[in-house]
Amino acid sequence: MKKRMGIVAAVATAMLCSSFAFAAPIKIGLMAPITGAFASEGQDMQKICELMTEELNKAGGINGNKVQLVIEDDGSTPRSAATAASRLVAADVCAAIGTYGSAVTEASQDIYDEAGIVQIGTGSTSIRLTAKGMKRFFRTCPRDDEQGRVAQSTLAKFGFKKIAI
């Protein structure tokens, strides 16, 4: 459910792309681990985004413009991520969603930022990612330090004294 909400937020954010009058479809990039260590997550992201794109287009698109989902496989590696990000920039997407894994996301951040493209990470928790201060980078999950703080607070609230991971 959390993953789906993140994807919903990402697609909604991509509506920023619709502030201009487009004759062509609005291109939204999905950079996801279709292969590699996180393939199951990436394949789920792909299915969700394809379904949402279909539903958006059936409802008339965004401001009357059809949405085109452009998919690139980041292979779950930073090197592949840089290539995938460059391909999405070349495809002229207005936003890139779905980057999963902090190292993969970080490898693509500068590429998207320099191109002026909004990037929405859906499974990237490293503090470094937002510490850079990139104005077009967003994420749908909490940072590592926030997860620890909330976990500690929740465990204390329920009176747990010892935990095991």
Identify the meaning behind each predicted range:
Residues 1-9:
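Bacterial N-terminal signal peptides that target proteins for export
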Residues 10-11, 21:
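Cleavable N-terminal signal peptides
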Residues 17-23:
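Sec/Tat signal peptide C-region and signal peptidase I cleavage site
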Residues 25-33, 67-71, 161-163:
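Short, well-ordered beta-strand elements
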Residues 29-48, 72-79, 100-103:
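Extracytoplasmic "Venus flytrap"
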Residues 46-69:
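Signal peptide-proximal N-terminal region
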Residues 90-165:
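Extracytoplasmic ligand/sensor domains, especially the bilobed periplasmic-binding protein
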